[in-house]
């Protein structure tokens, strides 16, 4: 199996920051997520930065990008409900040691252009200190 790449969409038990702060350690459900960035750490392991995809419209104080219909089709999600990639909440995981990520079969992948838009928006938010990270291996 190949390593996940930026722009690929998987099912993953995403842990929201509010759940993490309440002491929860596992996501409540497996949901579609997008791999935003992958990097190698000092040990040569693959760190993935994971963003949730939701059908809940973001409130005004949140940061998200709506998923266009063509991208929804590319990854095989339901077209009858609008979707957003949340940019201000990130899970980080290490591929080689993840104990929560069971099914690593991609559902599909966003186009390179849309994946680049997600990545650029995420990096801008992170630089501005407006993105929170939940480390799934802590």
Regions from the language model: what does each represent?
Residues 2, 67-138:
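C-terminal terminal-subdomain/extension
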Residues 20-30, 36-73:
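Compact nucleic-acid interaction/catalytic patches
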Residues 4, 31-32:
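Proline-centered helix-kink/hinge sites
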């Amino acid at each position: 199996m190949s390593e996940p790449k930026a722009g690929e969409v998987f099912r993953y038990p995403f842990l929201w920051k509010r759940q993490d702060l309440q002491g929860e350690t596992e996501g409540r459900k497996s949901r579609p997520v997008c791999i935003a960035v992958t990097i190698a750490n000092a040990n040569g392991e693959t760190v993935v930065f994971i963003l949730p995809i939701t059908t809940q419209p973001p409130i005004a104080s949140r940061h998200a990008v709506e998923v266009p219909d063509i991208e929804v089709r590319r990854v095989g999600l339901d077209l009858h409900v609008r979707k957003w990639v949340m940019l201000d909440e990130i899970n980080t995981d290490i591929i080689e040691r993840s104990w929560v990520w069971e099914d690593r079969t991609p559902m599909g992948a966003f186009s390179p252009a849309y994946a680049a838009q997600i990545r650029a928006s995420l990096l801008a938010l992170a630089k501005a200190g407006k993105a929170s990270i939940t480390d799934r291996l802590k």
